């Protein structure tokens, strides 16, 4: 009987409309995206980048830990030994279509060479443009170095 009375007096509709009316006069929470951008968390996992030392030398020591830990098998590394005996990468590819942005590659890297940066606007029309090679990753690192360094500094206590 009570359910009949509730449906007769349109109780559900009145309840829903009161909820709508409650939020109607509150300030809007949406933003006009291309023109306004919201705050990005320091722990945000975006576009990958390879970092360099202050001297300009790349940080990656070709230990291949990131390749081994990647659950999606999105990273391919080939390395050669230099004249001074140190190993460096000759090929460092990341297939961004396979990547699940878990951050395990960043956690596994002993020298903070591979990081996931603050950029989330890297859409592409072709599959080939989403396969990042070493040069593109180094360019990303050079472009985002200040943001990457501050991001790693903020997260240092929790690592």
From Swiss-Prot:
It is an enzyme of class 7 (translocase). [4Fe-4S] cluster 2 binds at residues 70, 99, 102, 105. It is found in: Cell inner membrane. It is a peripheral membrane protein. Belongs to the complex I 23 kDa subunit family. NDH-1 shuttles electrons from NADH, via FMN and iron-sulfur (Fe-S) centers, to quinones in the respiratory chain. The immediate electron acceptor for the enzyme in this species is believed to be ubiquinone. Couples the redox reaction to proton translocation (for every two electrons transferred, four hydrogen ions are translocated across the cytoplasmic membrane), and thus conserves the redox energy in a proton gradient. HAMAP family: NDH1_NuoI (MF_01351). This is NADH-quinone oxidoreductase subunit I.
């Amino acid at each position: 009987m009570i359910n009949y009375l509730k449906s007769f007096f349109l109780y559900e509709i009145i309840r829903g409309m009161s909820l709508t009316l409650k939020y109607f006069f509150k300030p809007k929470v949406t933003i006009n995206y291309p023109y306004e951008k919201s705050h990005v968390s320091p722990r945000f996992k975006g576009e990958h980048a390879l970092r360099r030392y202050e001297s300009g030398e790349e940080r990656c020591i070709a230990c291949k830990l990131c390749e081994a830990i990647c659950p999606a098998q999105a990273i391919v590394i080939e390395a050669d030994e230099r004249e001074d005996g140190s190993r460096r990468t000759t090929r460092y590819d990341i297939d961004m279509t396979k990547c699940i942005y878990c951050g395990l590659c960043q956690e596994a890297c002993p020298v903070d060479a591979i990081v996931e940066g603050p950029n989330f606007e890297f859409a592409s029309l072709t599959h080939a443009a989403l396969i990042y090679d070493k040069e593109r990753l180094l360019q990303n690192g050079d472009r985002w170095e200040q943001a990457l360094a501050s991001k790693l500094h903020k997260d240092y206590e929790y690592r």
